[in-house]
A protein has these predicted regions:
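Solvent-exposed loop/turn segments at secondary-structure junctions
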Residues: 78-81, 103-108, 373-375, 405-409, ...
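A cross-family glycoside hydrolase active-site/sugar-binding cleft signature
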Residues: 370, 401-405, 432-435, 459-460, ...
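Hydrolase catalytic cores
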Residues: 346-349, 367-373, 444, 514-570
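Subtilisin-like serine protease catalytic core
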Residues: 58-214, 218-221, 225-244, 248-252, ...
């Protein structure tokens, strides 16, 4: 009897969910004070496709089911917090990117070395400390709260027990800081490394050219002084001076002495301000002769989830980062991104950029879970994915997206699958993943997206509306006319992986638009970029899942991954 009632209840919930999903194409724009989608045609249609899955129509008819109250975990190469439409919702105030974590360890810095700061003789408002690089670093006293000292519990007066006499207490001790060091090139993507190297080389060439000009002027003056017209003989000292000038010129003109550029060295300072641990990075702008020249621009960063602030290494690289602290702040984690892939994926799922250019679920919040290792060219590892799954559970994600995949021999097995099953079945977190770009042959799906029954595997689809703006394909027949779209045929991309798996599973659950032009990392020097692949199809499906979860939460419908998957597949 109980099982029958449970079955009837589940059927009722599923019917309610289907009634929400079934929408009619919107014929006009619906205005809403918090709406983020437009039902009218737009010149941006096709850049970030939403009509193919009726996501645009769904949010137009249900403006408050736009993904709000849903948290999407993006397991990828990291998200740039400064990218367009990523940090805040459409109102510019409500946080969208609510946390950033690095599960690879590529940004970890050992800051276990402690030193006590000293008074700065040049400025009473500053303290100073010698960093591990050997540079003297200046710190603003205002960075500490008014009540913070290492001996804050010390009384201003001390009384001896024997005599009862009162003596003035010694001055409070200056605070301690923790120091670390990190090469900037260990954080930067390869494209940023090359750009910074070119910038540093141009600066070096300018300085070298100035020295060359000075030496050549000295040689010219020497030759004029001892020319035949002057009839003056050089002394041994004059000859040594000429030889010295010539030797300096030869060294400056010789390129063999040039070695590989190691890049900037970042001094990391971690301190407790009385409320939270904070970190400051010195040395990012190597155009300055003194790292303290940019003191006014430095912002002591707390863990990103607390204040949601981020820093930029320098204006040349435009590399944005956040920080976290581990092991009682003895390890500083610098969290950035290693390719624009993760930011692009996040933009497809939940970009907030007005009614025409928003992502599939613009009201959803994001958590950046970095699993692509910067030291390995953005490649993932088993340990990073396992940590990412555990982080998604710990941080309270509702759905996660993984646009990564590798080949495997045994489907539905391994440590990653065990953790994924526990996350899906025990914690009710839906796992959406790309199936791979190894098609069109059969049984080409990747793991874990196409090889695990607990994961919602997504293949890539291209519609006629996507072909024109993305690939400049106006028609695939000779009959071009007003109804040009009728000449196109929507289909899966030729390279989209196909099932079944070795154990007979389908491998692919659904198809979703596999291309988009949307936001990318600031360090690319671009606002948006075209990318295509099942990596782009998966976050689109993830955004659709977020829309349904948002509707279920608003309507009081219990959420479970099988219910959402069944509703989408049907």
């Amino acid at each position: 009897m109980d099982q029958r009632l449970h079955s009837q209840s589940s059927g009722t919930h599923f019917s309610r969910l289907l009634s929400i999903i079934i929408t009619r194409p919107a014929e006009h724009t619906m205005t809403d004070d918090e709406g983020t989608m437009s039902g009218n045609g737009s010149p941006y249609d096709g850049l970030l496709p939403r009509r193919e899955t009726q996501a645009l129509d769904f949010v137009t008819q249900h403006p408050r089911y736009d993904g709000r109250t849903v948290i999407i975990g993006i397991l990828d190469t990291g998200i740039d917090p400064g990218a367009h439409g990523i940090r805040y919702m459409a109102d510019g105030k409500t946080p969208k990117l609510i946390d950033m974590v690095d599960c690879t360890g590529s940004g970890d810095v050992d800051v276990s070395t402690e030193k006590r700061v000293e008074e700065c003789e040049d400025d009473v408002e500053l303290w100073q400390v010698k960093g591990l690089s050997g540079r003297t670093l200046k710190l603003k006293k205002s960075w500490w709260k008014a009540t913070e000292t290492d001996d804050k519990k010390e009384r201003h007066e001390s009384t001896t027990r024997d005599t009862g006499r009162t003596f003035p207490a010694r001055p409070p001790a200056l605070p301690k800081v923790r120091l670390g060091i990190k090469r900037a090139f260990e954080l930067f993507p390869s494209a940023v490394v090359q750009r910074v190297k070119r910038h540093r080389q141009r600066r070096l060439d300018r300085e070298t050219d100035a020295y060359v000009a000075d030496v050549q002027r000295e040689l010219t003056a020497w030759q004029e002084k001892f020319s035949a017209a002057n009839n003056k003989k050089p002394t041994p000292e004059d000859l040594r001076h000429k030889e010295d000038c010539q030797a300096r010129l030869d060294v400056l003109m010789d390129k063999e002495w040039e070695t590989e550029d190691p890049g900037m060295i970042l001094d990391c300072v971690v301190f407790h301000d009385g409320q939270d641990y904070r970190a400051v990075l010195y040395g990012g702008n190597d155009d300055l002769h003194d790292v303290n020249e940019e003191l006014d621009q430095l912002i002591p960063l707390a863990a990103y989830r607390k204040e949601r602030q981020y820093g930029t290494v320098s204006s040349v690289d435009q590399y944005n980062y956040a920080v976290n602290f581990h092991d009682d702040a003895s390890v500083l984690s610098i969290v950035g991104d290693c390719t624009p892939h993760g930011t692009h994926v996040a933009g497809i799922a939940a970009l907030a950029d007005g009614p025409d250019r928003s992502g599939v679920a613009p009201g959803a919040q994001l958590i950046s879970i970095k699993i692509g290792d910067s030291r390995l060219g953005s490649m993932e590892t088993t340990s990073s994915i396992c940590r990412g799954i555990m982080a998604a559970v710990r941080l309270g994600c509702d759905v996660i997206n993984l646009s990564y995949g590798e080949g495997c021999q045994l489907p539905n097995s391994g440590r990653i699958v065990e953790l994924a099953e526990e996350m899906v079945w025990r914690h009710n977190i839906m796992f959406v993943s790309a199936v791979g770009n190894n098609g069109p042959a059969l049984s080409t799906v990747n793991a874990p997206g196409g090889m695990s029954t607990c994961i919602f595997g997504v293949a890539a689809y291209v519609s006629p509306e996507m072909m024109r703006p993305m690939y400049s394909i106006t028609s695939n027949t000779d009959n071009e006319g007003e109804n040009d779209d009728d000449n196109h045929v929507g289909t899966t991309y030729t390279w989209s992986s196909v099932g079944p798996t070795a154990d007979g599973s389908l491998g692919v659950c659904v198809c979703a638009p596999g291309g988009a032009i949307t936001s990318v990392s600031n360090w690319t020097m671009q606002k948006s970029m075209l990318m295509n692949g099942t990596s782009m199809a998966s976050p689109h499906a993830c955004g659709c899942v977020a829309l349904l979860m948002s509707a279920c939460k608003a309507e009081g419908i219990p959420i479970s991954p099988p219910r959402i998957q069944r509703a989408i597949e049907n």
